[in-house]
Protein backbone atom coordinates (compact mmCIF):
# COMPACT_ATOMS: atom_id res chain seq x y z
CA UNK A 1 0.00 0.00 0.00
CA UNK A 2 2.79 2.48 0.79
CA UNK A 3 5.21 0.78 -1.59
CA UNK A 4 5.63 2.69 -4.82
CA UNK A 5 8.29 0.70 -6.65
CA UNK A 6 6.06 -1.24 -9.07
CA UNK A 7 6.38 -0.13 -12.67
CA UNK A 8 3.22 1.36 -14.16
CA UNK A 9 2.54 -1.69 -16.34
CA UNK A 10 2.92 -4.01 -13.35
CA UNK A 11 0.86 -2.04 -10.85
CA UNK A 12 -2.26 -4.17 -11.32
CA UNK A 13 -4.75 -3.41 -8.59
CA UNK A 14 -6.37 -6.33 -6.83
CA UNK A 15 -10.09 -6.55 -6.25
CA UNK A 16 -9.71 -6.79 -2.47
CA UNK A 17 -7.48 -3.96 -1.24
CA UNK A 18 -8.08 -4.93 2.37
CA UNK A 19 -9.88 -7.72 4.22
CA UNK A 20 -13.64 -7.56 3.70
CA UNK A 21 -13.56 -4.79 1.07
CA UNK A 22 -14.19 -5.58 -2.60
CA UNK A 23 -13.67 -3.01 -5.38
CA UNK A 24 -14.89 -4.50 -8.66
CA UNK A 25 -14.11 -1.60 -11.00
CA UNK A 26 -10.34 -1.97 -10.65
CA UNK A 27 -8.03 -2.88 -13.52
CA UNK A 28 -10.35 -1.41 -16.15
CA UNK A 29 -7.90 -1.86 -19.04
CA UNK A 30 -7.44 -5.59 -18.60
CA UNK A 31 -11.15 -6.12 -17.93
CA UNK A 32 -11.93 -4.30 -21.18
CA UNK A 33 -9.53 -6.52 -23.15
CA UNK A 34 -10.93 -9.67 -21.53
CA UNK A 35 -14.53 -8.83 -22.37
CA UNK A 36 -13.63 -7.67 -25.89
CA UNK A 37 -11.88 -10.99 -26.54
CA UNK A 38 -15.04 -12.80 -25.53
CA UNK A 39 -17.11 -10.54 -27.79
CA UNK A 40 -14.79 -11.41 -30.68
CA UNK A 41 -15.36 -15.13 -30.17
CA UNK A 42 -12.61 -16.30 -27.85
CA UNK A 43 -14.07 -19.20 -25.90
CA UNK A 44 -11.28 -20.32 -23.56
CA UNK A 45 -10.19 -18.16 -20.65
CA UNK A 46 -7.58 -18.87 -17.98
CA UNK A 47 -7.27 -16.67 -14.91
CA UNK A 48 -4.00 -16.42 -13.01
CA UNK A 49 -2.52 -14.61 -10.07
CA UNK A 50 0.98 -13.23 -9.80
CA UNK A 51 0.68 -12.68 -6.05
CA UNK A 52 -1.84 -12.78 -3.25
CA UNK A 53 -3.12 -9.37 -2.14
CA UNK A 54 -0.50 -7.49 -0.13
CA UNK A 55 -2.23 -8.09 3.19
CA UNK A 56 -1.99 -11.87 2.70
CA UNK A 57 1.80 -11.74 2.34
CA UNK A 58 4.56 -11.99 4.93
CA UNK A 59 6.31 -8.87 3.66
CA UNK A 60 3.23 -6.71 3.17
CA UNK A 61 4.15 -6.40 -0.50
CA UNK A 62 3.04 -8.11 -3.72
CA UNK A 63 6.63 -7.97 -5.00
CA UNK A 64 8.00 -10.70 -2.77
CA UNK A 65 9.64 -11.50 0.53
CA UNK A 66 12.64 -9.50 1.67
CA UNK A 67 14.85 -12.60 1.32
CA UNK A 68 13.15 -14.01 -1.79
CA UNK A 69 11.56 -16.84 0.20
CA UNK A 70 7.94 -17.90 0.45
CA UNK A 71 5.74 -14.84 0.84
CA UNK A 72 2.22 -16.27 1.25
CA UNK A 73 1.32 -16.42 4.92
CA UNK A 74 0.31 -19.94 6.00
CA UNK A 75 -2.88 -18.60 7.59
CA UNK A 76 -3.84 -17.02 4.26
CA UNK A 77 -3.86 -20.15 2.06
CA UNK A 78 -7.63 -20.57 2.51
CA UNK A 79 -8.43 -16.85 2.24
CA UNK A 80 -6.32 -16.56 -0.94
CA UNK A 81 -8.14 -19.53 -2.46
CA UNK A 82 -11.44 -17.88 -1.50
CA UNK A 83 -10.27 -14.62 -3.07
CA UNK A 84 -9.50 -16.35 -6.37
CA UNK A 85 -12.79 -18.27 -6.40
CA UNK A 86 -14.76 -15.14 -5.51
CA UNK A 87 -13.21 -13.30 -8.47
CA UNK A 88 -14.02 -16.21 -10.79
CA UNK A 89 -17.61 -16.35 -9.49
CA UNK A 90 -17.95 -12.58 -9.93
CA UNK A 91 -17.04 -12.83 -13.60
CA UNK A 92 -19.50 -15.70 -14.06
CA UNK A 93 -22.33 -13.91 -12.25
CA UNK A 94 -21.80 -10.31 -13.40
CA UNK A 95 -20.21 -10.68 -16.84
CA UNK A 96 -21.44 -14.11 -17.93
CA UNK A 97 -17.83 -15.22 -18.38
CA UNK A 98 -16.64 -18.56 -17.04
CA UNK A 99 -12.94 -19.22 -16.70
CA UNK A 100 -12.08 -22.70 -17.93
CA UNK A 101 -8.88 -22.71 -15.88
CA UNK A 102 -7.36 -20.82 -12.98
CA UNK A 103 -3.81 -20.94 -11.71
CA UNK A 104 -2.95 -19.44 -8.34
CA UNK A 105 0.75 -20.07 -9.05
CA UNK A 106 2.61 -17.94 -11.57
CA UNK A 107 6.33 -18.76 -11.44
CA UNK A 108 6.07 -19.78 -7.77
CA UNK A 109 9.74 -20.76 -7.46
CA UNK A 110 11.17 -17.70 -9.20
CA UNK A 111 14.22 -16.54 -7.26
CA UNK A 112 13.67 -12.99 -8.48
CA UNK A 113 10.48 -12.36 -6.45
CA UNK A 114 12.02 -10.14 -3.80
CA UNK A 115 10.68 -7.17 -1.90
CA UNK A 116 11.17 -4.01 -3.94
CA UNK A 117 10.82 -5.66 -7.34
CA UNK A 118 9.30 -3.68 -10.19
CA UNK A 119 6.66 -6.38 -10.79
CA UNK A 120 4.34 -8.38 -8.56
CA UNK A 121 5.20 -12.01 -7.86
CA UNK A 122 5.31 -14.49 -5.01
CA UNK A 123 7.48 -17.45 -4.11
CA UNK A 124 5.27 -20.32 -2.95
CA UNK A 125 7.22 -23.42 -1.88
CA UNK A 126 6.04 -26.81 -3.22
CA UNK A 127 4.35 -28.01 -0.01
CA UNK A 128 2.40 -24.78 0.26
CA UNK A 129 1.56 -24.96 -3.46
CA UNK A 130 -0.16 -28.31 -2.91
CA UNK A 131 -2.25 -26.87 -0.06
CA UNK A 132 -3.19 -23.83 -2.16
CA UNK A 133 -4.20 -25.90 -5.17
CA UNK A 134 -6.40 -28.12 -2.98
CA UNK A 135 -7.94 -25.11 -1.20
CA UNK A 136 -8.61 -23.41 -4.54
CA UNK A 137 -10.44 -26.48 -5.84
CA UNK A 138 -12.61 -26.53 -2.70
CA UNK A 139 -13.34 -22.80 -2.96
CA UNK A 140 -14.34 -23.11 -6.63
CA UNK A 141 -16.57 -26.11 -5.85
CA UNK A 142 -18.27 -24.18 -3.04
CA UNK A 143 -19.29 -21.55 -5.60
CA UNK A 144 -20.53 -24.07 -8.14
CA UNK A 145 -17.64 -23.45 -10.52
CA UNK A 146 -16.24 -26.22 -12.71
CA UNK A 147 -13.15 -24.14 -13.50
CA UNK A 148 -10.05 -26.33 -13.61
CA UNK A 149 -7.13 -25.59 -11.29
CA UNK A 150 -3.76 -25.50 -13.04
CA UNK A 151 -0.19 -24.88 -12.01
CA UNK A 152 2.54 -24.51 -11.26
CA UNK A 153 3.61 -22.25 -14.11
CA UNK A 154 7.33 -22.15 -13.49
CA UNK A 155 10.10 -20.55 -15.49
CA UNK A 156 12.12 -23.78 -15.66
CA UNK A 157 10.99 -27.35 -16.23
CA UNK A 158 13.14 -28.51 -13.32
CA UNK A 159 11.23 -26.21 -10.97
CA UNK A 160 7.89 -27.58 -12.15
CA UNK A 161 9.07 -31.16 -11.69
CA UNK A 162 10.36 -30.31 -8.21
CA UNK A 163 6.99 -28.83 -7.27
CA UNK A 164 4.93 -31.66 -8.74
CA UNK A 165 7.02 -34.26 -6.89
CA UNK A 166 5.96 -32.66 -3.60
CA UNK A 167 2.22 -32.65 -4.34
CA UNK A 168 0.03 -35.01 -2.37
CA UNK A 169 -2.91 -36.99 -3.77
CA UNK A 170 -5.40 -34.23 -2.91
CA UNK A 171 -3.46 -31.67 -4.96
CA UNK A 172 -3.28 -34.06 -7.91
CA UNK A 173 -7.07 -34.61 -7.75
CA UNK A 174 -7.72 -30.87 -7.60
Residue ranges and their predicted role:
Residues 78-101, 108-174:
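Active-site neighborhood of glycoside hydrolase catalytic domains
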Residues 1-100, 104, 120, 124, ...:
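N-terminal catalytic cores of secreted or lumenal carbohydrate-active enzymes
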